[in-house]
Design a protein with these regions (language model features):
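S-adenosyl-L-methionine-dependent methyltransferase catalytic core, i.e., the SAM/SAH-binding region
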Residues: 1-314
Length: 314
């Protein structure tokens, strides 16, 4: 991939896939010294645009073809935009030759994806239970709800949805699907209401729909597998920044960054170091950076965002 300078940014109106980027200036600050940046989750191109404005060479990738089209409309020729999953970035020869000194991941689902009922991420009435990031990603949410064993359903609602009645909800889904296959959002909403009671509402639906989405897309496993590869692609002294929105995602990022920063890889109870290990770098953010109250007021979906960064050893 040839080296090219940042070109003028397009000034046209917003695209249909309009999305408000979270922690925009905080990301720009963490990556301010980077000259070659890989945006691993392009979305509508908001972060990439801000980084390109600062003079960086930006390559933006996304697994979602709708996001790729939106990012291209936003960025024009100011950045290179490709359809590629960040989990596959380490195996891509063009990205390896780029040798980025900055990498950004903004995890989760963007507002346009949530708001597009046809994508199946929403609990709006009649929305299809799809939730896949791309059409060839594997089983839909409906297929997973109809086929997964009760134990798998319960584990997903407990681990990804922090649901105390996860097993009861799993049993209710199994009971209902025996006579009526899950197909649209109403089917899952009604099962949730049957278990959580009449006081259940949008916050519960959002939390449990998110759990299904995470399970269907294998998001936590994908993140855990991708991080070591991205560190390998990152040039020495470079910064890897990750924005997470779910406690499970944040735990993975926090744990991995801490492990990378350890000088010794021996078991904790081993009294003498025998590995002669060397830390892979340092954690830049001792605590996660969170949105300001003003940002949350302007964009409520930013409320759960957590930003962490790691600098690779020189």
């Amino acid at each position: 991939m040839g080296d090219k300078g940042a070109r003028p940014l397009p000034s046209g109106g917003p695209s249909v896939f309009e999305h408000r980027s979270v922690l925009l200036e905080e990301v720009a600050g963490l990556l301010s010294g980077c000259r070659r940046i890989l945006d691993g989750t392009a979305g509508a191109g908001g972060h990439a645009r801000r980084l390109a404005e600062a003079g960086a060479l930006v390559v933006a990738i996304d697994r979602d073809p709708d996001a790729v089209r939106a990012a291209r409309a936003t960025l024009g020729e100011s950045a290179t935009v490709r359809q590629l999953d960040f989990a596959d970035a380490a195996r891509d020869s063009d990205l390896s030759s780029l040798a980025p000194d900055g990498i950004l991941l903004d995890l989760g689902v963007s507002s346009p994806q949530i708001d597009d009922a046809s994508r199946g991420f929403t609990f709006r009435p009649g929305a299809p239970l799809d939730m896949r990031m791309t059409a060839d990603d594997g089983p839909t949410a409906a297929q997973w709800l109809n086929d997964a064993p009760a134990a798998e359903l319960g584990a997903a609602f407990a681990d990804f949805g922090d649901e105390p009645r996860a097993r009861a909800l799993a049993r209710e889904i199994v009971r209902r699907r025996a006579s009526h296959a899950f197909a649209v959002s109403d089917d899952l909403v009604n099962a949730i209401r049957a278990v959580l009671g009449p006081r259940s509402g949008p916050a519960d639906f959002a939390r449990l729909f998110q759990a299904v989405r995470i399970a269907v897309n294998g998001e936590l496993d994908r993140l855990a597998r991708a991080l070591p590869g991205l560190l390998g692609v990152l040039s020495s002294g470079g910064v890897l920044a990750v924005i997470s929105y779910h406690s499970g995602e944040d735990r993975i990022v926090k744990h991995v960054f801490r492990e990378w920063a350890r000088d010794c890889g021996c078991p904790p109870r081993q009294p003498v170091c025998t590995c002669r290990g060397r830390a892979l770098g340092t954690v830049v953010t001792k605590r996660a950076i969170v949105p300001t109250p003003d940002e949350v007021a302007a964009n409520p979906r930013a409320r759960s965002a957590r930003l962490r960064a790691f600098r690779k050893a020189a």
